[in-house]
């Protein structure tokens, strides 16, 4: 008989203590003890997007291996909002890569109510500046529709580790020159 070691979890959202098998991920814990969080200043609820585990931000795939104090967070929390926006960026990146395999999405900088993004050709103009692709209204609608489909399919995000060399090769093959330059600036490439 195999005995699973139990760990203690304190959920700050409801002030309750729980026991879970060691290695249980935060999504499973959230589903059982705190499936949604109440927004501050209102009674509206939002999905759990991440968690503060002993006051450190963790994604929902994080596996709890020891006793922790956990606070599940949603969109109303600054870290929850950043998690949500970053997730949308990954979805948009995948959709652009799918619809325009010969182009690159560049998420350039933050604006007060969003992010400034450009779809660029992989090749630069003669003066070295990036050549921007301007999507039509129909193309934007197609991008939005595909993003919705991808989100509704509820595919998980999978984090992988790669060597710096493999990462640079990947960025080079996708025409992401800024990321290649950033990686090279770390000085760890031969």
Please name every model-derived segment:
Residues 1-89, 94-96, 100-112, 122, ...:
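Ubiquitin-like/PB1-type beta-grasp interaction modules and other compact soluble beta-rich domains
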Residues 111, 123-190:
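Non-catalytic interaction/regulatory segments
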Residues 118-120:
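Short hydrophobic/aromatic beta-strand micro-patches
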């Amino acid at each position: 008989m195999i005995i699973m070691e139990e760990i203690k979890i304190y959920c700050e959202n409801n002030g309750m203590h729980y026991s879970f098998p060691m290695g249980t991920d935060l999504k499973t814990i959230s589903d059982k003890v705190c499936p949604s969080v109440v927004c501050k200043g209102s009674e509206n609820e939002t999905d759990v997007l991440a968690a503060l585990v002993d006051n450190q931000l963790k994604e929902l795939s994080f596996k709890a291996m020891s006793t922790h104090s956990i606070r599940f967070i949603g969109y109303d929390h600054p870290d929850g909002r950043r998690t949500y926006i970053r997730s949308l960026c990954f979805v948009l990146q995948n959709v652009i890569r799918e619809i325009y395999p010969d182009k690159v999405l560049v998420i350039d900088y933050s604006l007060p109510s969003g992010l400034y993004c450009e779809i660029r050709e992989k090749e630069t103009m003669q003066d070295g500046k990036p050549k921007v692709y301007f999507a039509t209204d129909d193309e934007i609608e197609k991008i939005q529709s595909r993003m919705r489909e991808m989100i509704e399919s509820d595919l998980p995000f999978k984090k992988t580790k790669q060597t710096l060399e493999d990462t640079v090769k990947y960025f080079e093959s996708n025409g992401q020159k800024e990321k290649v330059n950033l990686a090279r600036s770390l000085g760890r490439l031969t």
